Regions:
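Conserved GNAT acetyl-CoA-binding A-motif
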Residues: 44-46, 50, 73-86
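Conserved acyl-donor/pantetheine-binding loop and adjacent beta-alpha core of acyl/acetyltransferases
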Residues: 1-49
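Conserved acetyl-CoA-binding loop-helix of GNAT-fold acetyltransferases
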Residues: 49-52, 58-75, 94-98
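N-terminal start-of-chain detector that recognizes signal peptides
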Residues: 19-25, 54, 87-91
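C-terminal "cap" of GNAT-fold acetyltransferases
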Residues: 44, 86-93, 97-99, 105-121
């Protein structure tokens, strides 16, 4: 899906980060996505990404979506799972903890805006 997005959105790499609008910052991320640290993938290879609109949060929808995804991942043989959570998203960290995820301790990976969390499948 990255290639399709890249066709629709120009790469604003020619602009300095300070000069980019919020939309251009997102467009830059489409063309230059941050990579998941290898220490995360080697420990917890399965990956899930979930965004819910605020009006849909705290209604059990996220937990139900995770249950369906988790069952499919387990059926395909996933051994452990990871999510990357924005450190500023104070509601997301407790949500993932409620589903059994814990913060991963990663030697050699500097603390950034992403909190890496994992759990056994």
């Amino acid at each position: 899906w990255w290639p399709a997005l890249r066709k629709n959105y120009a790469d604003p790499a020619h602009l300095s980060p300070e000069a980019r609008t919020p939309d251009q910052r997102r467009m830059y991320m489409i063309h230059h996505p941050a990579r998941t640290p290898s220490a995360v993938v080697s420990t917890c290879p399965g990956h899930l990404h979930m965004n819910l609109l605020p009006r849909l949060q705290r209604r059990g929808i996220g937990s139900k979506l995770f249950a369906v995804w988790h069952a499919a991942a387990a059926a395909k043989g996933a051994s452990a799972l990871h999510v990357g959570v924005n450190r500023e998203n104070r509601n997301a960290i407790p949500f993932w903890q409620s589903l059994g995820f814990t913060e991963l301790t990663l030697a050699g990976v500097p603390e950034g805006r992403t909190v890496w969390m994992g759990r056994k499948a």
